[in-house]
Regions:
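Active-site neighborhoods and metal-handling regions in enzymes and metal-associated proteins
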Residues: 207-209, 218-245
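A short, sequence-level motif marking secondary-structure junctions
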Residues: 4-8, 174-177, 239-244
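Active-site microenvironments in enzyme catalytic cores
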Residues: 12-225
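Gly/serine-rich nucleotide phosphate-binding loop at the start of the catalytic core
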Residues: 1-16
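Short, well-ordered strand-loop elements centered on a beta-strand within folded domains, enriched
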Residues: 1-3, 164-173, 232-236
Length: 245
């Protein structure tokens, strides 16, 4: 479908047979009460992800690295490192002359990191998030490797890209991350990111057309709510307008 030149026109003129209502499908997907549930809206495509794309995440990656995966050390490092380099990373265009100047300054202060290199350097961090056909869909439980004690969901916008590199649409995803594993060594990124059911995508792809474009997506806000069985509630959000690369 994504290989078509005008996907939205094809879909506008497509006629299908109604199998189930959206409301019923959402309910069965969430409750797992039948065999009918939503799958991830991708099949044979490679599932890639980019890391260190926000200034805030750059600081967090440096904290993980300095803490060597120990969450107990993270808070004091967050106050120290965030105060030193947090503001200097705002509004920097990766690979620019200003980015090079900041890099030199941070190196002289002993604060340069491989994560800052992919955050404001000329080359982005691109990694394999999940194996083909391994992503789970809306309503499915995500997987957490039991070797991890410090981990988190990462709500993301997922781009639907065809084989020519053309972005045809977007959806939502959960880039589950094991912070204590990656924090020990960047070479453990694959172990921290690619686990059973660690990639959730869906529910649907919003195909770009005249009413919703890539430019519209760049100003989108993503919200996340985590509710624990013990009554713990966490609300968070991120804005695509703050993305740095």
């Amino acid at each position: 479908l994504l290989e078509l030149e005008n996907v939205h026109e094809y879909l506008d003129h497509s006629v299908g047979e109604k199998v189930i209502s959206i409301e019923e499908l959402f309910e069965t997907s969430l409750k797992r009460t039948s065999n009918m549930s939503l799958l991830a809206p991708c099949d044979f495509q490679a599932v890639k992800a980019c890391g260190v794309t926000f200034a805030k995440s750059m600081v967090e990656r440096v904290i993980e690295e300095r803490a060597a995966g120990d969450p107990k050390k993270a808070e004091s490092l967050r106050n120290h490192i965030g105060g030193l380099i947090g503001d200097s990373l705002q509004d920097i265009v990766p690979g620019s002359e200003k980015a090079s100047e900041v890099k030199k300054a941070l190196i002289s202060e002993g604060l340069w990191s491989q994560y800052l290199e992919v955050g404001i350097g000329k080359d982005a961090e691109v990694f394999t998030k999940a194996q083909t056909l391994s992503s789970v869909g809306f309503g499915s439980e995500v997987g957490l490797n039991p070797i991890s004690n410090w981990n988190n969901p990462e709500p993301e916008i997922v781009l639907a890209v065809n084989s020519k590199g053309i972005i045809q649409g977007a959806t939502l995803g959960n880039d589950v991350n094991l912070r204590d594993i990656e924090g020990r060594s960047a070479l453990l990124l694959g172990k921290a990111k690619d686990n059973n059911a660690s990639c959730s995508i869906g529910p649907f792809i919003r195909i770009f057309d005249d009413s919703y474009t890539l430019e519209d997506m760049k100003s989108a806000n993503i919200s996340l709510k985590v509710e624990g069985k013990e009554g713990y509630i966490l609300n968070g959000s991120s804005s695509m307008s703050e993305i740095s690369r």
